[in-house]
Swiss-Prot record:
Main localization (coarse): nucleus
Annotated protein name in UniProt: U3 small nucleolar RNA-associated protein 4 homolog
Native source species: Mus musculus (Mouse)
Gene expressing this chain: Utp4
Compartments, as annotated in UniProt: Nucleus, Nucleolus; Chromosome
Quaternary structure and partners: Interacts with HIVEP1 Interacts with NOL11. Part of the small subunit (SSU) processome, composed of more than 70 proteins and the RNA chaperone small nucleolar RNA (snoRNA) U3. May be a component of the proposed t-UTP subcomplex of the ribosomal small subunit (SSU) processome containing at least UTP4, WDR43, HEATR1, UTP15, WDR75.
WD repeat start-end pairs: 14-53, 57-96, 99-138, 143-181, 193-231, 234-273, 285-322, 324-359, 435-474, 482-521, 524-563
Post-translational modification: May be phosphorylated during mitosis; may control the association of this protein with WRD43 and UTP15.
């Protein structure tokens, strides 16, 4: 792999927001996740659980409910009393609508997807029609005395169950009237609580209503008679979430103790047709409250305060026992939050509402491989740049020369000029920006820092020339097709002649920046692009996809390189394909044109194109060779993929120069330490 001096950075104090809601779309096999800061993420479960889209958060837009309707349309609602629809192409908010019922606690779509119901603070249940352009208010159901905390439609679309404080109501959809009310027992282990909060309800085809509540119970009700059929005490704290499989043969609940319980409908005896709900499996993959759960055909999905999104496969429902059956725990966003100025040894860290600029430390000490060297100069925190307004930062970048910083929110674009005088730094905002620079999904500077490249959410790419005293718009590349496709990833060649852009449809377009025209489009591939970069000298474009495939495309020749064709012909090593985190960054060695450097959250790899490709008989993760190396061992370990798992979780890694790497890690224990304390559970013998 070679010997590098590594700046091991652990002062990026990033803490993801907790998960508040999840919504699974069975038609597209996608999962929507909302976080406590209002951020909404879309995961493509068919594309190796890749986070293919996200919508930035907003301080006044905390999400309490999230659902899919009308096929591929996504809606959310929250305590500001508004319903939002998301534009999944342009990646922005399509519109907002006030429900006029105070804070919204719950929302659900009808089985047909043509109607939405929201439950409000004032006790109202409001029905909306989903039209092609937007939603329209239809009517109110009978108002209740307390807030509506949970809602669920009957699969036939004729009735609705609503959970409140101390009771569950069953509505007739046609009339909007209550036809049944079930009162809950507030007792927990012999102690009567002041309130019983119905956090979640589910309505089954046979008329059974399942409720989860604040006294730790999962209860099954007969909606026709209003009687309690079965009660399961599963926790000493709140049961906060529930989701049912489409086949209605299993459901999952999440508790405030961090436990997820799986219930299944099983036959009482081998010859009996009588079935009963049985708690079969408890899972403890969370440390804090499990605020949201979902049930896909093959997995249980959960998320909560500890920020982890956990996908727990149901082994009996996974046809092929391969890496798809492995537990997934997603913590970090599948996009870069860090940029680097190699020339000045700077790192720019992106947080929700501020940026931090750091200068790396240095050492004059020397040592052997594996030694930790003492710093002769500590890292400097040069700048803390706080945003104005309630919107989260979408993207940011520091220029290679370290003299420019740009960032964007959903409605504003900011550009700053930095000047360095000895140990002091001054910041000057560029105030007169062109009107088209309102918002960006990705920002990039050219290698010489003279060009600013901006991808807007309307599918256009803006090229701007920068100099100390001027700001000139050079060109705008318009979307290639009639539909708006947001460009999420950009890569510029070191010579400044080529720009590669990838959009939400997994296509990659290459633009000629010298002649300001589209040069070519890379052949389409079925999986989203996770990272891309253009190599110096050769101008070969290296593309990583969510299924862990890596391609090399010659921009001058408009075709895949011979090395890439050989790699695809032989295929990747099975252990490489089984990795469950996407490649998020690609770079190149300035003096070794045959080397490609890339990393995901748990692995750093140098691909040496001059060496043989690994096959299934080779050892992919190269251990240190023994002192007495045998020819057999050398043949099994000498290949072009040199991998290291020393640094993890790895949020960013890049070459500063030909002998120096910078690696930014974020240990999970540091994140957990900054979360609120979990509920303490009494253990046996304590």
């Amino acid at each position: 792999m070679g010997e590098f001096k590594v700046h091991r950075v652990r002062f990026f104090n990033y803490v993801p927001s907790g998960i508040r809601c999840v919504a699974y779309n069975n038609q597209s096999n996608r999962l929507a996740v909302s976080r406590t800061d209002g951020t909404v993420e879309i995961y493509n479960l068919s594309a190796n659980y890749f986070q293919e889209k996200f919508f930035p958060g907003h301080e006044s837009r905390g999400t309490e409910a999230l659902c899919w309707a009308g096929g591929q349309r996504l809606f959310s609602a929250g305590l500001n009393g508004e319903i939002l629809e998301y534009d999944l192409q342009a990646l922005n908010i399509k519109y907002t609508l006030d429900a006029f019922g105070g804070p919204i606690w719950s929302m659900t779509a009808s089985p047909s997807g043509s109607q939405l119901l929201v439950g409000c603070e004032d006790g109202s249940v409001k029905l909306f029609e989903v039209t092609p352009e937007k939603i329209q208010f239809a009517r109110n159901f009978d108002r209740q005395k307390s807030r509506i905390l949970s809602l669920c439609w009957h699969p036939a679309g004729t009735h609705v169950a609503a959970g409140s404080l101390d009771y569950i109501s069953v509505f007739d959809v046609k009339s909007g009237s209550i036809i049944r009310k079930m009162v809950l027992d507030r007792q927990h282990l012999g102690v009567t609580k002041s309130r019983c909060i119905v956090w979640g309800v589910a309505f089954l085809s046979d008329g059974t209503v399942i409720s989860v509540d604040s006294v730790g119970k999962v209860q099954l009700w007969d909606s026709a008679t209003g009687t309690l059929v079965k009660s399961h005490l599963v926790a000493n704290a709140d049961v906060q979430s529930i989701a049912v499989a489409d086949q209605e043969d299993s459901f999952v609940v999440g508790t405030a103790e961090g436990t997820v319980f799986h219930f299944q409908l099983v036959s009482m005896t081998s010859n009996s047709s009588e079935k009963q709900w049985v708690r079969t499996k408890p899972f403890q993959h969370h440390t804090h409250d499990v605020r949201a759960v979902a049930h896909s055909p093959t997995a249980l999905i959960s998320g909560g305060t500890d920020t982890h999104l956990v996908i727990r496969p149901l082994m009996e429902r996974v046809e092929v026992k391969n890496y798809d059956a492995a537990l997934r725990k997603i913590t970090f966003p599948h996009r870069r939050l860090i940029s680097c100025s190699k020339r000045r040894q700077l790192l720019l860290f992106q947080f929700a509402h501020h940026l931090e600029l750091w200068r790396l430390g240095s050492t004059s000490a020397t040592g052997k491989n594996g030694d930790t060297l003492p710093l002769s100069k500590n890292a400097d925190h040069l700048l803390h740049l706080k945003t104005k307004g309630p919107e989260n930062i979408i993207c940011s970048c520091v220029s290679p020369c370290g003299s420019w910083i740009a960032y964007s929110t959903a409605s504003r674009f900011f550009l700053y000029r930095l000047k360095y005088e000895r140990d002091n730094i001054s910041l000057q905002r560029v105030s007169k920006l062109p009107s088209f620079l309102r918002s960006a999904l990705h920002i990039l500077f050219s290698e010489d820092s003279t060009k600013l490249l901006v991808a807007s959410n309307q599918g256009s790419l803006h090229i701007v020339h920068l100099s100390e005293g001027s700001f000139k718009h050079l060109h705008t590349f318009q979307p290639q097709s009639g539909t708006v496709e947001a460009m999420c990833l950009l890569a510029v060649s070191p010579d400044g002649n080529w720009l590669a852009a990838s959009g939400t449809s997994a296509g990659v377009h290459v633009y000629d920046l010298h002649h300001l025209k589209l040069h070519c489009t890379v052949p389409a591939y079925n999986f989203p692009v996770t990272a891309l970069a253009i190599a110096p000298n050769t101008n070969n474009l290296v593309i990583a996809h969510s299924d862990q495939q890596v391609f090399e495309f010659s921009i001058p020749e408009k075709q895949y390189t011979e090395w890439s064709r050989s790699l695809q012909k032989q295929g990747f090593h099975q252990l490489w394909l089984q990795r469950d985190t996407p490649i998020t960054h690609i770079s190149f060695h300035p003096k070794r044109p045959m080397h490609i450097l890339l990393h995901d959250a748990y692995m750093f790899c140098i691909i040496d194109k001059s060496l043989p490709l690994p096959n299934e008989k080779t050892v992919l993760y190269n251990p240190l060779p023994p002192k007495n190396e045998s020819d057999v061992f050398l043949r099994r370990t000498t290949h072009g993929f040199k991998m290291s798992k020393i640094y993890k979780p790895l949020l960013f890694m890049d070459l500063l120069d030909e002998r120096t790497l910078v690696a930014v890690e974020r240990p999970l224990d540091d994140i957990i330490a900054q979360l609120p304390p979990p509920i303490k559970k009494k253990k046996f013998g304590t």
